[in-house]
């Protein structure tokens, strides 16, 4: 059962439309579906709200600590409401997946994602769900860069091209059903639905 869905991103208008905020976009979509307005919750270091989704109450959270410090926000809300790590889904941008794809997995390393690294450190476990939203990689972009650290930072902190944005939005829409399946406790089925479309 899933009790908390966290979207990773950076706060502020200048970051709103950047690839690094794909997790925020998913949580915004869920908030609209659940008829919930996320409000500033200083004790949780972010914007939070309780939504009625898939016939159950689910907390939605957008940390306002900037990506690399997301763990403080996640652990604050999880501890307050006694939510276990395996009841948490963290949605984040994933450069190793093309724009328009999404993958669901439980546990594993951070894959170089500093937001996940910080969350794992604060939760003292990697045993939480990750919803990886593909945003592509600079080496695969038209006129693509080599993909060094500076190229990667520039890439994720820029808005996607129009066709990429459309593909990412469609991927987010495709995540909603499988997230509902996961929230009901059917993890294998949720992964199959998302990964195979069945």
From Swiss-Prot:
The organism's place on the tree of life at top rank: Bacteria
Site residues, Stabilizes the basic form of H active site to accept a proton: 93
Keywords: Cytoplasm, Hydrolase, RNA-binding, tRNA-binding
Protein's GO biological process: protein quality control for misfolded or incompletely synthesized proteins; rescue of stalled ribosome
Enzyme class: hydrolase
Pfam family, one: Pept_tRNA_hydro
Any one GO MF annotation of this record: peptidyl-tRNA hydrolase activity
Compartments, record wording: Cytoplasm
Active site residues per record: 20 (proton acceptor)
Family note: Belongs to the PTH family.
Assembly with partners or alone: Monomer.
Protein name: Peptidyl-tRNA hydrolase
Organism expressing this protein natively: Cupriavidus metallidurans (strain ATCC 43123 / DSM 2839 / NBRC 102507 / CH34)
Lineage of source species: Bacteria, Pseudomonadati, Pseudomonadota, Betaproteobacteria, Burkholderiales
């Amino acid at each position: 059962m899933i009790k908390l869905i966290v979207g990773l991103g950076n706060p502020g208008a200048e970051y709103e439309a950047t690839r690094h905020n794909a997790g925020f976009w998913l949580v915004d979509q869920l908030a609209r579906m659940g008829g919930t307005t996320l409000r500033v919750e200083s004790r949780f270091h972010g914007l939070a709200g309780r939504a009625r989704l898939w016939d159950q109450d689910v907390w939605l959270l957008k940390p306002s600590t900037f990506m690399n410090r997301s763990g403080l926000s996640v652990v604050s809300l999880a501890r307050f409401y006694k939510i276990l790590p395996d009841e948490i889904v963290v949605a984040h941008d994933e450069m190793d997946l093309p724009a328009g794809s999404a993958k669901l997995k439980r546990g594993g390393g951070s894959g170089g994602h500093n937001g996940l690294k910080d969350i794992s450190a604060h939760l003292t476990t990697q045993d939480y769900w990750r919803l990886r939203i593909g945003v592509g990689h600079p080496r695969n972009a038209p006129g693509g860069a080599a993909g060094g650290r500076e190229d990667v930072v520039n890439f994720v902190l820029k808005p996607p091209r129009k066709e990429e944005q459309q593909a990412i939005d469609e991927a987010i829409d495709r995540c909603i059903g499988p997230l509902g399946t996961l929230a009901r406790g059917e993890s294998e089925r949720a992964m199959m639905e998302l990964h195979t479309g069945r």
